[in-house]
């Protein structure tokens, strides 16, 4: 009786929902499932952030509509954090926009700039909302292969001239989900020059900048000369402070791009619960030792998993950022089938690489969001299949 729009029909099933369904079904059957699939931190939000929410929630003024552009205190806290972390000065009134998690901002941004037939240049494999947001805006996603032989960086010179002329946005994400690859200044300089020459907006997803190891410190594209003219950067409190369920992030960078996204959002949502924004101020302005301890915890888990994978003969790159390990499928089968084998025979959930795009075929992603004891148990199970 009712027919879905073509845009919705063009959207692939959301990978993580499909994985969650399979996981819940297995657990309902009484199976002991080790979930290495979805990247949802297993540790609690720091106590001082929860207390800030608790206190702010008691204030009746916070029960009303929030300001569309976010609390001034939160925008100022983000500006201070960016200055301290990256040495980047931002105007809190025009160059920062709080979001209901960075995901919604990333997905809504194409609505501001894509017309039918316009392209977004989307990493493949990549975070699904880049492609989904493009399709829902009426644009066309053009896949940029991220290949191991090129360190999982897009080869900008290989993008056809005809595509460049129709492209309005390029999405990049380093440290990368799902590959855990990183990018350095040389790549960002090339990207900025490419964007300026072709009049393309850079959307940089920096959600994993604070999850890093072995002395590595990820960059912000806004550190580089000329970036602010063509770039908008998205960040989130989800991974840094274990706040995935709180839904709080932001966009920062070019003031005109911020204003365009703000206009889209003003027609779609009514802002972020003010108490959550106050908690965000506490997160960014409070003690940061917790972040270091979380990175140390993930590092130990990474080392445990990498050691076990090496013993199994599975090929994986040792990540120096994010809490993901990108692993070559060790048998002659596709990633979905292999993930199914791990679920059925070992009660282990992993994410098939093809769920992030066709160039993710041949890989699976494991997340470091379970205890080291559970990782060891998973490795023991893998030995038996």
Question: Language-model segments: which ranges?
Answer:
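N-terminal small-domain helix-loop-helix segment of the aminotransferase-like
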Residues: 2-101, 108, 158, 284-286
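Helix C-cap/helix->beta junction micro-motif
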Residues: 26-29, 137, 197-198, 312, ...
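Conserved glycine-rich beta-strand-loop-beta hairpin in the small C-terminal domain of fold type I
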Residues: 281, 297-306, 316-328, 360
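Active-site phosphate-binding strand-loop segment of PLP-dependent enzymes
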Residues: 146-215
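Conserved core segment of the aminotransferase class I/II
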Residues: 224, 228-299, 303, 307-308, ...
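A short helix-loop-beta submotif of the ANL/AMP-binding
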Residues: 135-141
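Conserved PLP-anchoring active-site segment centered on the Schiff-base-forming lysine
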Residues: 112-134
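PLP-dependent enzyme catalytic core of the Aspartate aminotransferase-like
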Residues: 331-332, 341-351, 356-385
């Amino acid at each position: 009786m009712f027919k879905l729009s073509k845009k919705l029909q063009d959207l692939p099933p959301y990978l993580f929902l499909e994985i969650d369904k399979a996981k819940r079904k297995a657990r309902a059957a009484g199976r002991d499932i080790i979930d290495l699939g979805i990247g949802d931190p297993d540790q609690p939000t720091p106590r001082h952030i929860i207390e800030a929410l608790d206190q702010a929630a008691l204030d009746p003024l916070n029960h009303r509509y929030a300001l569309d552009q976010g609390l001034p205190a939160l925008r100022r806290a983000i500006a201070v954090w960016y200055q301290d972390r990256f040495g980047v000065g931002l105007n809190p009134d025009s160059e920062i926009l709080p979001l209901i998690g960075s995901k919604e901002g990333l997905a809504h941004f194409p609505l501001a700039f894509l017309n039918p037939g316009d392209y977004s240049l989307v990493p493949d494999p990549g975070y699904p909302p880049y492609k989904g947001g493009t399709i829902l805006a009426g644009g066309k996603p053009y896949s940029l292969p991220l290949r191991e032989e090129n360190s999982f960086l897009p080869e900008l010179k290989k993008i056809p001239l005809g595509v460049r002329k129709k492209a309005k946005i390029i999405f990049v994400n380093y440290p990368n989900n799902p590959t855990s690859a990183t990018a350095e200044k040389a790549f960002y300089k090339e990207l900025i020059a490419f964007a300026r020459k072709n009049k393309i907006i850079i959307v940089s997803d920096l959600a994993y900048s604070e999850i890093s190891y072995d002395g590595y410190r990820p960059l912000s594209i806004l550190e580089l000369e000329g970036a602010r003219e063509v770039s908008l950067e998205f960040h989130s409190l989800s991974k840094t402070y274990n706040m995935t369920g709180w839904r709080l992030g932001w966009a920062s960078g070019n003031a005109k791009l911020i204003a365009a996204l703000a206009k889209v959002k003003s027609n779609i949502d009514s802002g972020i619960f003010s108490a959550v924004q106050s908690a965000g101020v506490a997160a960014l302005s409070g003690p940061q030792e917790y972040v270091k301890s979380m990175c140390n915890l993930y590092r130990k888990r990474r080392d445990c998993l990498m050691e076990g994978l090496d013993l199994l003969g599975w090929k994986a790159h040792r990540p120096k950022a994010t809490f993901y390990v990108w692993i070559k499928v060790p048998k002659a089968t596709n990633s979905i089938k292999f993930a199914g084998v791990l679920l059925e025979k070992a009660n282990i959930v992993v994410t098939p690489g093809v769920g992030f795009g066709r160039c993710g075929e041949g890989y699976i992603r494991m997340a470091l969001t379970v205890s080291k004891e559970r990782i060891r148990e998973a490795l023991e199970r893998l030995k038996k299949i």
